[in-house]
Amino acid sequence: MTRQVEQIAITHIARHKGLDPATITPDADLAALGITSLDAIAIAYQIEEDLGIEIPNEEIEGLRTVRDLIDGLHRLTARRE
């Protein structure tokens, strides 16, 4: 599921901001991608729907990079399994 989680995160970021997913790397800074706090909430909601998890607001507030999001999603999906 590791690669799947990464792909879901990148796909939702790209779709939300109208970017090419191929241009988004795990080390990309969310602010540099134009992701605001409201964008992060909207993206998190979409990811929650796809993965069947709940992302706590505290997780969203601490995100700085795409990797931060991916790592948080891995923790949350591991708890579910």
Residue ranges and their predicted role:
Residues 43:
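Residues within the DNA-recognition helix of helix-turn-helix
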Residues 15-32, 52-59, 81:
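Phosphopantetheine carrier-protein modules
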Residues 54, 60-80:
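C-terminal structural segments of small proteins and small subunits
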Residues 1-22, 77-81:
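Thiotemplate assembly-line natural product biosynthesis machinery
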Residues 37:
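Catalytic nucleophile serine of serine hydrolases
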